[in-house]
Design a protein with these regions (language model features):
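Pyridoxal 5′-phosphate
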Residues: 1-395
Length: 395
């Protein structure tokens, strides 16, 4: 049996997405900027896809910019907000300590350009409050960027409350919704969101395509220079097949969101309950405000990479954190942000489920993870020191 439990890293593309993409490659293959009929058919498909994404977010189609993915959308949002702030003499940006690296690395770049970046501390349950955001706002704050839901530990942030604070203060609010889109209700109007990033491959769409929502009237900085595509805000011939697939996948995910949430949450909770029985283990993230498919644990006395390799040999595909940092010897910055010690953070496991996972697959995980953890601990000198009392248990 092979169990794919790494859906936070990427998802298998749905038949709905594939069926939307094939006509764009076989029939409507023209350049949407061309004036002839084949090009105009592609342009029409592009327009319909934009309308679909806009409906799912409750915004206007003209407020959607198609990108190559979430990272590009994040970069364009932050650089655009920074440019607005620089013109107004406002050089203070608020974010959190456990954002995706697409946000954190861009903020580092802006720091080198003279911006002051304030990273709010994260509570041990993986939450940041609207009160924290309100308390950090200054006269020279130009942007607040807070992720909708964390990719590693699954905590869902109070986006509507944070958005309301920013709207009241007249400060731009961006959210990285890459993990939330297609899984959680998003309404950019009700949630007071000015800019939002999403990525198609997180909800059974294709890789290499994403979108940036930008509230009307907010000027954008071009990250890619060239032609006049995307209203002159994102150069390069649009990836029409990818965009069509992403739009179809998002529409399908939103249509079945509640039934998927109920099914996946039940699988998640069963996994959390079963894995919690392993001695000296701990769940990461908030148990109530949590992505439906996210299961994140730390196991004391083991190393996460060894755990992943042995689980893979047992047919279980998982991760020890973000796939974007796979292979790094450093512990997860997310786990460190919620207060996990280095030695504990190294023994992390993330299982991320979707509606295609089954009870039988959960049974397999619940058999194999305890077995592998016990096996690794039996060989670990760190575990022996913990058992002998030379070192104190932390979990």
């Amino acid at each position: 049996m092979t169990v794919y439990a790494d859906n936070a890293a990427t998802t298998r593309m749905s038949r709905t997405a594939l069926d939307a993409m094939l006509p764009a490659m076989e029939e409507n293959y023209g350049n949407p900027s061309s004036l002839h009929s084949v090009g105009q058919r592609a342009a029409e498909l592009l327009m319909k896809s934009r309308e679909t994404v806009a409906r799912c977010l409750n915004c206007q189609p003209r407020e959607i910019i198609f990108t190559s993915g979430g990272s590009e959308a994040d970069n364009q949002a932050l650089l655009s907000a920074a440019a607005i702030g620089r013109r107004k003499g406002k050089m203070h940006i608020i974010s959190t300590a456990f954002e995706h690296h697409a946000i954190l690395h861009t903020l580092k770049k802006l720091e080198k350009e003279g911006f002051q970046v304030e990273l709010l501390p994260v509570h041990e349950n993986g939450m940041v409050s609207a009160r924290q955001v309100a308390g950090a706002i200054r006269e020279d704050t130009c942007l607040v960027t807070v992720m909708f839901a964390n990719n590693e530990i699954g905590s869902i942030l109070p986006i509507e409350e944070i958005g309301a604070v920013c709207r009241e203060k007249g400060i731009l609010f961006h959210t990285d919704a890459v993990q939330a889109a297609g899984h959680l209700p998003i309404d950019v109007q009700a949630q007071h969101i000015d800019m939002l990033s999403l990525s198609g491959h997180k909800f059974h769409g294709p890789k290499g395509v994403g979108a940036l929502y930008v509230r009307g009237g907010i000027p954008l900085v071009n990250v890619i220079e060239g032609g006049a595509q995307e209203r002159g805000k994102r150069a390069g011939t649009e990836n029409v097949p990818g965009i069509a697939g992403m739009a179809a996948a998002l529409e399908d995910a939103c249509a079945h969101m509640e039934e998927n949430r109920v099914k996946v949450t039940a699988l998640r909770d069963r996994l959390i309950q079963g894995l919690s029985k392993i001695p000296h283990s701990a769940v990461n993230g908030d148990l109530e405000h949590r992505l439906p498919g996210n299961v994140s644990f730390c196991f004391e006395g083991i190393e996460g990479e060894s755990l992943l390799l042995l689980l893979d040999a047992a047919g279980i595909c998982a991760s020890s954190g973000s796939a974007c940092t796979s292979g790094s010897l450093d512990p997860s910055h997310v786990l460190l942000a919620i207060g996990r010690p280095h030695e504990v953070a190294h023994g992390s496991l993330r299982l991320s489920l979707c509606e295609w996972n089954t009870q039988e697959e959960v049974d397999h995980i619940l058999r194999e993870v305890p077995r592998v953890v016990e096996y690794l601990r039996s060989m670990s000198p760190v575990w022996k020191d913990l058992e002998s009392g030379k070192k104190a248990f932390m979990l």
